[in-house]
Amino acid sequence: MSIVVKNNIHWVGQRDWEVRDFHGTEYKTLRGSSYNSYLIREEKNVLIDTVDHKFSREFVQNLRNEIDLADIDYIVINHAEEDHAGALTELMAQIPDTPIYCTANAIDSINGHHHHPEWNFNVVKTGDTLDIGNGKQLIFVETPMLHWPDSMMTYLTGDAVLFSNDAFGQHYCDEHLFNDEVDQTELFEQCQRYYANILTPFSRLVTPKITEILGFNLPVDMIATSHGVVWRDNPTQIVELYLKWAADYQEDRITIFYDTMSNNTRMMADAIAQGIAETDPRVAVKIFNVARSDKNEILTNVFRSKGVLVGTSTMNNVMMPKIAGLVEEMTGLRFRNKRASAFGSHGWSGGAVDRLSTRLQDAGFEMSLSLKAKWRPDQDALKLCREHGREIARQWALAPLPQSTVNTVVKEETSATTTADLGPRMQCSVCQWIYDPAKGEPMQDVAPGTPWSEVPDNFLCPECSLGKDVFEELASEAK
């Protein structure tokens, strides 16, 4: 089924509701994706891109229902990756002599994937045009490393449509094609996720390339992407967002992520977050356990943040493998204008936190002091964690802190009145983990200030996973 994009332009792509992994398993496409291909029917008929290789047969059959394949005059390949040009082999088997217009780098990539050097390739460069009749032309603009060396965009005069390739896209599947037809919150979340996880390394190229395209002084009524929606309602809004995201983007936000073996590093993360919130209540703080969280959501939050705190237990003298992998990804994403601090617990040897600090510095983060704890943090260690959080809040503040937080000395022990109001702390009789009503248990949506009597019956001990019935009033507080 085709969809009219504008006048003689039809979408002939493929929706993929079920795909959950992209680029191997590195990008989680939680809302599916689409592979957008466009058929332009003027005096000359032009196909712009194909679809993912796994849909090759369906694509060619659907295309045959729209047009006699022999009537396709030109094929434009904006990008040679398999989710864009994957159906070329199936298509070219039917129309082997059809001219393919692409960049010089794309020829190498296409041959590397499809192994057909005999195809009728035609190299185009920025500013080259192709007349398709009825007073309309295609204008080509090379966009190397956004995000492959072969990438380019194609502009259709007359209709003022920019076929933008991966730029301005999102892995987002919906029955509706246009941006004004879909859920706006979902759409912009997926746009930012896409930019943060795929295009961030090339941010330094985004602004100059957009400036170059704007320099052609061509009107843009629509932006037709390779994935997700077509921008027809105020298409410049996504361009403006890209310019914003490319400019060393940050919000007043701190991301904390960690991995842990015995919940010791997790206790540190919670205490650090409390210290930050006490000192700067305006900052948004998000905490993630990497073993239980969507990696791409973590990286999107890092992209949005002014700083990141990374925690790891020590395992065989080095950091936990999932932390090491995520830090390696952050190195490749080349985040800018962000600060970092490492923390973690260890037993007899240690070593992971120092190694982590070095890796974060190598990744381009401006480093703050790290923090270590031996074995399970006791009350004194947790006090240090909260103070570390306060210091981080002060060092990383984007604006002067509220005067009340500057002048107030935060007390570590809750006042007698407050303690009495919240009731006693409770200790797991199996593993000795302590529930403190003043802190709550954020990982189970138990807010700070929740007395034990109001903790849900399905609550589980974070360490041993046993229920409320194994908890007893802490001996030191028993009356």
Curated annotation (Swiss-Prot):
GO cellular component terms, A-Z: cytoplasm; protein-containing complex
Known role: Anaerobic nitric oxide reductase; uses NADH to detoxify nitric oxide (NO), protecting several 4Fe-4S NO-sensitive enzymes. Has at least 2 reductase partners, only one of which (NorW, flavorubredoxin reductase) has been identified. NO probably binds to the di-iron center; electrons enter from the reductase at rubredoxin and are transferred sequentially to the FMN center and the di-iron center. Also able to function as an aerobic oxygen reductase.
Xref: SUPFAM superfamilies: Flavoproteins, Metallo-hydrolase/oxidoreductase, Rubredoxin-like
The protein, known as: Anaerobic nitric oxide reductase flavorubredoxin
UniProt-listed GO biological process terms: nitric oxide catabolic process; response to nitric oxide
Organism per entry: Escherichia coli (strain K12)
Region Zinc metallo-hydrolase, residue ranges: 30-210
The protein's assembly and partners: Homotetramer.
GO molecular function: electron transfer activity; FMN binding; identical protein binding; iron ion binding; nitric oxide reductase activity; oxidoreductase activity; oxidoreductase activity, acting on other nitrogenous compounds as donors
Residues annotated to bind Fe cation 3: 428, 431, 461, 464
Pathway involvement of the protein, from the record: Nitrogen metabolism; nitric oxide reduction
Record-annotated Flavodoxin-like domain positions: 254-393
Co-factor note (free text): Binds 3 Fe cations per monomer.
Binding-site list for Fe cation 1: 79, 81, 147, 166
Binding, Fe cation 2: 83, 166, 227
Domain of life where this protein originates: Bacteria
CDD domains on file: flavodiiron_proteins_MBL-fold (cd07709), rubredoxin (cd00730)
Residue ranges constituting the Rubredoxin-like domain according to the UniProt record: 423-474
InterPro entries associated with the record: Anaer_NO_rdtase_flvorubredoxin, Flavodoxin/NO_synth, Flavoprotein-like_sf, Metallo-B-lactamas, ODP_dom, RibonucZ/Hydroxyglut_hydro, Rubredoxin-like_dom, Rubredoxin-O_OxRdtase
Cofactor(s) listed: Fe cation; FMN
